[in-house]
């Protein structure tokens, strides 16, 4: 028997991490304890999960946690180590409701492959229930009402007419640049595999694009690009269920 501890150190609170720590108290195969060092409203936070058991189930636990704890832009370090005695607890961490955290996309690694992959049987099921992130609870009635047929029609309109007002998301999409103003142009990346063909990116920028927050990042187009003429662009991946599915259709 050995004790291990898995740490996730963040520069600020990440409500989803606290929620996932709480969920792992239900992991019956091992003795689990959890905690958060410096768990307050400001400053660095280290979320941790401790487990006691034999080598094989401990390895299975570590693999499961690595899959569940998706990258956050606020994550600064993570690790696993052997400890002498657990320091955590069996009580739930106090946390803000992750469903109300607007900085995190309303989908995760469990539900996205089901509704966001064009080869999946439930592709386009915007209101798909997820037992992990519960992203469906954060959808508006207008978002929930959209079907795959609706989204395909929107994509067709964008392709044929050149623009689309996506009222349920409060945005407009266009195949051509909008009228220039003081702000940087913003681009939705529909095919992540083409990133390096268009932009000069570092590894940490690619990781940030794929993080649970799905942020806009500033990127410079490659030299002599035939269509991207601005010096800098704000780019992002699909950051909501609707935009993610629409991106997959347009891909």
Model-found features: residue ranges?
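A phosphate-binding glycine/aspartate-rich beta-alpha loop in the early core of alpha/beta enzymes
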Residues: 161-225
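Phosphate-interacting basic helix/loop segments used at nucleotide- and nucleic-acid interfaces
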Residues: 144-162, 199-202
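Long, charged N-terminal interaction/targeting segments
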Residues: 1-96, 195, 249
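Cys/His-rich short segments
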Residues: 81-152
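Gly-rich Lys/Arg/Thr-decorated short loops/hinges at beta-loop-alpha junctions or inter-strand turns
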Residues: 2, 133-137, 225-230
């Amino acid at each position: 028997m050995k004790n291990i501890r898995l740490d996730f150190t963040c520069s600020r609170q990440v409500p989803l991490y606290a929620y996932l720590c709480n969920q792992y108290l239900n992991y019956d195969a091992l003795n689990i304890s959890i905690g958060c060092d410096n768990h307050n409203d400001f400053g660095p936070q280290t979320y941790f999960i401790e487990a006691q058991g034999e080598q094989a189930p401990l390895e299975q636990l570590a693999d499961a946690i690595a899959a569940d704890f998706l990258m956050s832009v606020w994550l600064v370090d993570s690790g696993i180590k052997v400890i002498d005695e657990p320091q955590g607890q069996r009580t739930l961490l106090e946390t803000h409701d992750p469903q109300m955290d607007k900085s995190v996309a309303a989908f995760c690694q469990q539900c996205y492959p089901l509704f966001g992959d064009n080869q999946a049987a439930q592709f386009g099921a915007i209101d798909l229930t997820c037992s992990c992130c519960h992203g469906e609870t954060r959808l508006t009635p207008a978002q929930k009402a959209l079907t795959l047929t609706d989204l395909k029609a929107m994509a067709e309109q964008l392709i044929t007419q050149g623009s689309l007002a996506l009222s349920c998301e409060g945005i407009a999409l266009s195949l051509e640049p909008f009228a220039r103003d003081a702000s940087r142009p913003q681009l939705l990346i529909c095919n992540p595999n083409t990133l390096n063909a268009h932009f000069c990116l570092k590894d940490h920028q690619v990781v940030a694009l794929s993080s649970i927050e799905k942020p806009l990042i500033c990127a410079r187009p490659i030299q002599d690009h035939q269509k991207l003429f601005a010096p800098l662009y704000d780019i992002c991946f699909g950051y909501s269920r609707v935009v993610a599915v629409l991106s997959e259709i347009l891909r």
